[in-house]
Amino acid sequence: MQTFVKGKRVGYWLSEKKIKKLNFQTFVDLCRKQGIEMIQLDLSQPIESQGPFDVIIHKLTDHIVDADQNVTESLLLVQGVQDYIDAHPETVILDPLPAIRTLLDRCKSYKLIHKLEHSMEDDRICSPPFMVLKTECGFETLEQLHKHGITFPFICKPQVAHGTNSHEMAIIFSEEDLKDIKPPCVLQSFINHNAVLYKVFVVGEAYSVVQRPSIRNFPSGPTDRRAISFNSHHVSKPESSSHLTCRDNMVGQSWKPSNEVIQKISRKLHQALGISLFGIDIIINNQTGQHAVIDINAFPGYEGVPEFFDDLLSHISSVLQGQVCNGVACGHLRVNGTAQSQTVHCGMLGNDSSWLMDSEGIKKGPHQGLSCCGGCMTPNFHQHTRSSLTAETSSQ
């Protein structure tokens, strides 16, 4: 680790639940071994008295949601953090509070996805039609669905994309079940994707793709099937197995995610929001092969990503350095745990469509860098590439 990180101070605030789930103390110890001073923030006390900080890492989503609902304690805590940020523009915040607020509102994040889709002008990328429903369904609802290009079946999701209730969803198959929809919520067209979800976990310049179970295929158009309620978190667990995730009715093709497409989407989100720690849920249309972003998550759980701590330390080091490789795209490859000195372009590694199965039974794609180029992912072996996103964005 470079000497420039020694003596740097990094503040962090995560809920106790998040700290335990990530085993974050291991990361704290890793940083301290590299000479980085890690300070757990006490939000009940002025942050000014706990600083100064070169970087602050946080997951304040619970408090931000509560603050937006005028919960006094959370209002004060979030305002305290914002006051420190305003007073210390030199401190790097992972990630910016306005960006987190965007990701906590599915309406805002879906609008952003649509905007980015148009700017990318890539036929391999699509964003499902959606609309926001703020009141109970009425006679005009069908007209609104048609206006927004939403057809049956569609998914009904809570507008707030955080908390236990954010995972409670329903698939609506016909006009008859519109009366059961409880606003405020977001209605999003359902795309058949052969019951496979790809979770993209981004950390600075690196990302990993993990394959998870998802909702099975359903016939297009209205049917007499009753609405199905489900918890998306439970459905997409690695071990999930139910009638909802059954793959017996697979049709079309089972497409693998395109490395180039995922890099493009990740870079655009990074550029638009200035975020570094986020997850992207992607499904692939089983007829067209188009990649559809169906959700974006702030500071996800990184389950199935053993490189998370290494990537986070690398990103913090790059942030502290103030640049990445002097603006030149660079990277290293890790094969079976052994670091290689060469710069790697993802397209050099072939187009094998197999996926690795880790010790926990989680199906995974290779670990990539955002600046790599190439086509489909190539999981012949475990790949770990870091490259400079700064170099990519500076030329655009």
Swiss-Prot record:
Positions annotated to bind ATP: 106, 157, 188-199, 214, 232, 236
GO MF terms held by the record: ATP binding; inositol-1,3,4,5-tetrakisphosphate 6-kinase activity; inositol-1,3,4-trisphosphate 5-kinase activity; inositol-1,3,4-trisphosphate 6-kinase activity; inositol-3,4,5,6-tetrakisphosphate 1-kinase activity; inositol-3,4,6-trisphosphate 1-kinase activity; isomerase activity; magnesium ion binding
Residues noted as binding Mg(2+) 2 in the record, renumbered to the chain: 295, 297
InterPro entries: ATP-grasp, Inositol_tetrakis-P_1-kinase, InsP(3)kin_ATP-grasp, ITPK1_N
Positions that bind Mg(2+) 1: 281, 295
Matches recorded under Pfam families: Ins134_P3_kin, Ins134_P3_kin_N
Cofactor(s) of this protein: Mg(2+)
Enzyme Commission (EC) number: 2.7.1.134, 2.7.1.159
All copies of domain ATP-grasp, residue ranges: 117-325
Binding-site positions, 1D-myo-inositol 1,3,4-trisphosphate: 18, 167, 199, 297
Catalytic activity line of the entry: 1D-myo-inositol 3,4,5,6-tetrakisphosphate + ATP = 1D-myo-inositol 1,3,4,5,6-pentakisphosphate + ADP + H(+); 1D-myo-inositol 1,3,4-trisphosphate + ATP = 1D-myo-inositol 1,3,4,5-tetrakisphosphate + ADP + H(+); 1D-myo-inositol 1,3,4-trisphosphate + ATP = 1D-myo-inositol 1,3,4,6-tetrakisphosphate + ADP + H(+); 1D-myo-inositol 3,4,6-trisphosphate + ATP = 1D-myo-inositol 1,3,4,6-tetrakisphosphate + ADP + H(+)
Keywords of the record: ATP-binding, Isomerase, Kinase, Magnesium, Metal-binding, Nucleotide-binding, Transferase
Record note on cofactor: Binds 2 magnesium ions per subunit.
Gene3D superfamilies given in the database record: 3.30.1490.220, 3.40.50.11370, ATP-grasp fold, B domain (3.30.470.20)
GO biological process entries: inositol trisphosphate metabolic process; necroptotic process
PANTHER family reported for this sequence: INOSITOL-TETRAKISPHOSPHATE 1-KINASE (PTHR14217:SF1)
Oligomeric form and interacting partners: Monomer.
Protein family (similarity comment): Belongs to the ITPK1 family.
Biological role stated in the UniProt entry: Kinase that can phosphorylate various inositol polyphosphate such as Ins(3,4,5,6)P4 or Ins(1,3,4)P3. Phosphorylates Ins(3,4,5,6)P4 at position 1 to form Ins(1,3,4,5,6)P5. This reaction is thought to have regulatory importance, since Ins(3,4,5,6)P4 is an inhibitor of plasma membrane Ca(2+)-activated Cl(-) channels, while Ins(1,3,4,5,6)P5 is not. Also phosphorylates Ins(1,3,4)P3 on O-5 and O-6 to form Ins(1,3,4,6)P4, an essential molecule in the hexakisphosphate (InsP6) pathway.
Name of the featured protein: Inositol-tetrakisphosphate 1-kinase
Protein's organism: Danio rerio (Zebrafish)
Name of the gene encoding the protein in the UniProt record: itpk1
